[in-house]
């Protein structure tokens, strides 16, 4: 760009009109990925947000730096939920989050490398204990399935009605397992000739939920929620920062990838959403996570609300957000 920093370093702006745009972007991100890998502990993990423009290039860079064997997941995050009718082709509604481990665990018995956490279970209201079952709260599941699981047999209900499997379904349990469940009072018989149901006990399910690769706005927030969050912190200058991530999204990633004593590094920290999420999650689960935020002091546009409010560069916005979020 022809500009120079106060230290005498040449500043370069990579625009899409530059003939080497993608190559320059890859060079920029590659060096940062190498540094990130060196900073990760053996059980560490990295999450990288990216859109369609560089997703393919980022995946190749990550495969080379971390090794394709250490790829964990590519998450699709619902960034916006409204349709953009002015779009020429498709209205884009999502971004990606690539996840790589320093060392990936391939089997449940592995003890070295990254171990993802289960997400908190928030649907326990579906479980109850109307019959005072000694195993505790339960909910019902079908005893039949679409796919073949067990050989054919009949079930005799306490009222004498004989139940056969439906023609288009199969038993979900073997006959021996069904007999054991009946003996353990783990079957809900129902009235008349209705199909019995199996009890699924809350004590038998996992302590949490396995994360999936689709993050809906209800699960992880979206860009409109992110804007409302930062505007609520900077009420005197709404619109202080564009393109920020929702705290809920980063919190979900922290729940999956971090432990209570971990150090979280964000080297594109922007408005410091990651720091905000770390503090919020610590308050929720009693953790003592620490954060390191890295951001170049990019100047704010003089016409922007941030500049008018006295913030000369992005770092000043991030530091003030950390202070204000910490007070809440």
Regions found by a protein language model. Name each.
Residues 1-263, 285-288, 296-304:
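Class I S-adenosyl-L-methionine
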Residues 262-281:
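A phosphate-binding catalytic loop at a beta-strand-loop-alpha-helix junction
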Residues 280-328:
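PRPP-dependent phosphoribosyltransferase catalytic core
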